[in-house]
């Protein structure tokens, strides 16, 4: 495995490869969910690139950029054992130029609801860095987890509308044995908070149970699910279509249920595709 920090070195190495290339962009603090993406890339491509970059432009002023977990040595070891070909670990000054003027704006509707409403400017930063990383790595396929559903859908939209020649591959959410969606931020949780956080996935199970028994009215499903979340600080629990617009009734094959809540100081996301 080669560890690369320079965009020019990455592009030079990439030009030497003629076969299929998979790309897994991450912010580090790698866990089993990331490893699943890497394994999928390895299985579907001749070469695989992983990036680790805590992107400053997707964090707001009062968010946890400075405290986001960083484990470069452990992450490099995980990538080495997984058979990654190139680990790209740039610094902010390698990705962004002083006085950058060519910016990217998230879609006015789907980019400023849900996470976009809670974190203004977040998806501008996400799309900007993902586009840069895709151009630097020129992958055949790029892998993104469904846990960050809104991010995934917006990246797919960007790829489609900008005619990017890269396949965006969605990958199912990985969970621990209790059902908690894996996240780098789980490291912040105490044992008591981890138990409390299980209410998040439990609320999705509750919603599924009622849908399976024939309840299709979104308001009724939401009401029942929110009872499971009592005691947790819920930011939103929404039932939307694939364009992230609200649905009054469940449409199987077109519905996503998204929940975001705070447990202690930790903000956690989860979702269910129906």
Curated annotation (Swiss-Prot):
Residues that coordinate or bind (R)-pantoate: 58, 151
Highest taxon of the lineage: Bacteria
EC id: 6.3.2.1
Record's function text: Catalyzes the condensation of pantoate with beta-alanine in an ATP-dependent reaction via a pantoyl-adenylate intermediate.
Family statement: Belongs to the pantothenate synthetase family.
Subunit structure: Homodimer.
Identification of the protein by name: Pantothenate synthetase
Gene designation: panC
């Amino acid at each position: 495995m080669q560890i690369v920090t320079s965009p020019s070195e990455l592009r030079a190495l990439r030009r030497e490869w003629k076969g299929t290339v998979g790309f897994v962009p991450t912010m580090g603090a790698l866990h089993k969910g990331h490893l699943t993406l890497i394994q999928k890339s390895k299985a579907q491509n001749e070469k695989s690139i992983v990036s680790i970059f805590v992107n400053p432009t997707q964090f707001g002023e009062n968010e946890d950029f400075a405290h986001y977990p960083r484990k470069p040595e452990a992450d490099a070891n995980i990538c080495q054992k997984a058979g990654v070909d190139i680990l790209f670990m740039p610094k902010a000054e390698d990705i962004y130029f002083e006085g950058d003027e060519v910016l990217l704006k998230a879609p006015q509707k789907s980019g400023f609801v849900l996470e976009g409403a809670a974190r203004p400017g977040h998806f501008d930063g996400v799309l900007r860095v993902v586009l840069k990383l895709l151009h630097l790595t020129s992958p055949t396929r790029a892998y993104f987890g469904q846990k960050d559903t809104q991010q995934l859908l917006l990246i797919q939209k960007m790829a489609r509308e900008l005619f990017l020649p890269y396949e965006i591959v969605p990958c199912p959410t990985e969970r621990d044995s209790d059902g908690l969606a894996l996240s780098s931020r789980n490291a912040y949780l105490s044992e008591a908070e981890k138990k409390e956080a299980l209410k998040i996935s439990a609320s999705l199970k509750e919603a599924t149970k009622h849908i399976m028994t024939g309840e299709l009215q979104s308001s009724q499903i939401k009401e029942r699910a929110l009872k499971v979340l009592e005691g947790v600080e819920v930011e939103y629990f929404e039932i939307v279509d694939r364009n992230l617009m609200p649905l009054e009734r469940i449409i199987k094959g077109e519905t996503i249920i998204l929940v975001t809540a705070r447990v202690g100081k930790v903000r956690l996301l989860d979702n269910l595709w129906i």
